[in-house]
């Protein structure tokens, strides 16, 4: 249980920091180009707790799937899980693109950032929640 909690906390901290840096700093101008598609900043900040809840849910889900015995464990398994989960997210973004007026550039950049986020999350979780070694080996 200790590894689970530590992996969750580490993944959550990374996801929050990466989201702030990638979306809030690196993609700030790209998001500004599509500002009409988003809530005003003041309103968004009033709902910021929902972002944190969503990021906690993402970290928790990642660790739960990994801890359920995902492909033997270790960093490589964490990376594979991260790639699979981001493929799922990109698939959902394709539907968003078809049904909502999001610029393709924004969705592509969000997806690139998503792959980085999920791969690094996989490395973090895989390193912390690595398989237990047999005694005496």
Question: Residue spans of the language-model regions?
Answer:
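Juxtamembrane/disordered regions of integral membrane proteins
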Residues: 1-137
